[in-house]
Curated annotation (Swiss-Prot):
Residues 25-60 have a biased composition (Basic and acidic residues). The modification Leucine amide is found at residue 77. This is Kassorin-S. It comes from the Eukaryota. Residues 24-60 are annotated as: Disordered. It comes from Kassina senegalensis. Residues 23-64 form a propeptide. Antimicrobial peptide. Active against the Gram-positive bacterium S.aureus (MIC=30 uM) and the yeast C.albicans (MIC=100 uM). Not effective against the Gram-negative bacterium E.coli at concentrations up to 250 uM. Lacks ability to induce contraction of smooth muscle in isolated guinea pig urinary bladder. Elicits histamine release from rat peritoneal mast cells. One of its GO terms (biological process) is defense response to bacterium. Expressed by the skin glands.
Length: 78
C-alpha cells in the first residue's frame, strides 16, 4: 500500500510539472502572438498614415494643376 501511494504521488507530481510546463509554453506563445499582432497593427497604421499623406499630396498637386490651367484659360480669354 505504501508503494502504491508513493507511485501515485510521483505520477501526480510529474503530471503537475508537465502541466505547468505546458501552461508556461502556451502563455509564451500567446505573448509572442500578441506582440506579432501589435507589430502588424503598427505596420498597418503606418501604411494607412502613408496612404493618407500620399492622398493629401496628390490632392494638393491636382489643385495646383487645376489652378494653373484655370489661370492660363482666363489669361487667354481675358
Amino acid at each position: 500500500m505504501l508503494t502504491l501511494k508513493k507511485s501515485m504521488l510521483l505520477l501526480f507530481f510529474l503530471g503537475m510539472v508537465s502541466l505547468s510546463l505546458a501552461n508556461s509554453k502556451r502563455a509564451d506563445e500567446e505573448g509572442e502572438d500578441k506582440r506579432a499582432d501589435e507589430e502588424g497593427e503598427d505596420k498597418r497604421a503606418d501604411e494607412e498614415g502613408e496612404d493618407k499623406r500620399a492622398d493629401e499630396e496628390g490632392e494638393e498637386k491636382r489643385k495646383r494643376f487645376l489652378g494653373g490651367i484655370l489661370n492660363t484659360i482666363t489669361g487667354l480669354l481675358g
